[in-house]
Amino acid sequence: MGKNFSRFAAVLLAVSMPAAAFAYTFDRDVPANIKTQMLDDLSFVGTIQGSQASSLHQQIFGQVDGATYNQFFSSRVMSVGMNGCGDGNAVACVIPMQDSSKIWLPQNYIKFSHPQIARLMVVFHESRHTEDANDNWPHANCPTPFLDKDGSDMKSVWTGASLAGEPACDETPFGSYGSSMIMLKNISKFCTNCSDKVKMDAGIYADDQFKRLISPDAIAQVQKDLYSGQ
């Protein structure tokens, strides 16, 4: 995520919904395989069924339910295009001064291979950045140094880039990092029709994104909501 887009860019997601049912469009420069992949990913998320939802998930999305996720995404994102996003470390971005309902994909989204649920994490992260009424949920700068529990530098799970000092953290569970990790953690815990692999991947990526929350209050809220008893 680039400093020039520190408020807006993200370095930081039964029966399938047919691709024609999606309301958003793809620019011509989006590679055909990436368009197909994203449509397949969003069709998959539309099939999810859950037994329950955590309190924070209910506040942000509602129930753990495919139709709920599709409505959340399609009510925010109208189009997808290609853009460098201002920084070689970016994975995707929204640029509100150009179009706050458009997700832009740089080469990092294409060239790195990650599980389907991780790709959904990225685009749902970006969908939160479309919310003009919430100032597009700007990120906070990560601490310097920014270390994990073992004392190693925190790095992007997607690109491996160092996060210290970068606008790649959040101080609220309701921003892009918090909302997407809450979504994935709920899928990991409560999805009733997901494979073990999907639930495992969702848990791994959710736990990684949880580390992007840097305020004690935000951390405490998510711990109480999703990690108590673990």
Located regions from the model:
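Bacterial N-terminal signal peptides
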Residues: 9-18
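Predominantly extracellular/secreted Zn2+-dependent metalloproteases
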Residues: 21-120, 130-230
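Bacterial N-terminal signal peptides that target proteins for export
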Residues: 1-9
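Walker B catalytic acidic pair
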Residues: 126
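Substrate/cofactor-recognition hotspot
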Residues: 123
